[in-house]
């Protein structure tokens, strides 16, 4: 994402970053995604969602990361800046969860169109317990009343049994790599998680 920001006015620093990315691609050509119906989740769609709270120091916006898995490997993923300034980590994660739900709905519809209908709720894995609780609550509380109503469709999908939001430890959060820069050791571990290895 850092490299993408410099595309409008690329300079020498952007070229150095680009060369580093190209060297990374050359050195990792042997790494890939493997799909298998014998995977842990079989042919169940699952999603991992994460957010960094106010990661953009210039604007205060958070970054959303979502990874969708099917047959043991990622089939869709995204990393994007949120369009609202979240005043808490719970809000940032909940906004990210809203984006994940939209992706899940789209992919469930796609699977239905090819006769792979998802009967059970799609598991969405989130590493913020407050956001998990918020998604399952039916009341708007004083702590959450400021959150824009457009994000509360998450609760509706949970109530209908379309999605089931579950807590996952941060160390096992596959979407973490999509929200922030990580150190070398954590990056290598998260890369394997993201690929479903």
Predicted features and spans:
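RNase H-like nuclease module associated with reverse transcription
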Residues: 6, 40, 44, 80-197
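Active-site-proximal structural scaffolding
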Residues: 14, 26, 61, 100-103, ...
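Structured nucleic-acid-interacting core domains from mobile-element enzymes and related host factors
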Residues: 23-49, 116-118
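C-terminal reverse transcriptase regions that engage the nucleic-acid substrate
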Residues: 1-33, 169, 178-179
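RNase H-like nuclease fold core
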Residues: 47-90
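Conserved helix-loop functional segments at active or binding sites
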Residues: 27-31, 54, 74-77, 106, ...
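Short glycine-rich loop/turn motifs
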Residues: 19, 30, 44, 62-67
């Amino acid at each position: 994402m850092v490299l993408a920001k410099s595309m409008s006015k690329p300079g020498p620093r952007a070229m150095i970053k680009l060369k580093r990315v190209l060297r990374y691609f050359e050195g990792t050509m042997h790494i890939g995604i493997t799909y298998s119906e014998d995977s842990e989740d079989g042919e169940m769609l699952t999603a991992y969602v994460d957010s960094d709270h106010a990661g953009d120091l210039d604007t205060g916006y958070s970054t959303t990361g979502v990874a969708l898995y099917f047959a043991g490997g990622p089939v869709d993923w995204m990393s994007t800046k949120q369009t609202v300034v979240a005043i808490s980590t719970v809000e940032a994660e909940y906004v990210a969860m809203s984006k994940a739900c939209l992706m899940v709905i789209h992919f469930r519809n796609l699977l239905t169109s090819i006769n792979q209908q998802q009967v059970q709720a799609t598991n969405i894995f989130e590493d913020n317990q407050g956001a998990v609780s918020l998604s399952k609550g039916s009341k708007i509380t004083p702590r959450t009343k400021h959150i824009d109503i457009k994000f509360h469709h998450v609760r509706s999908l949970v109530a209908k049994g379309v999605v089931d939001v579950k807590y996952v430890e941060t160390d096992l959060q596959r979407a973490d790599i999509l929200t922030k820069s990580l150190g070398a050791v954590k990056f290598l571990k998260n890369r394997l998680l993201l690929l479903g290895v």
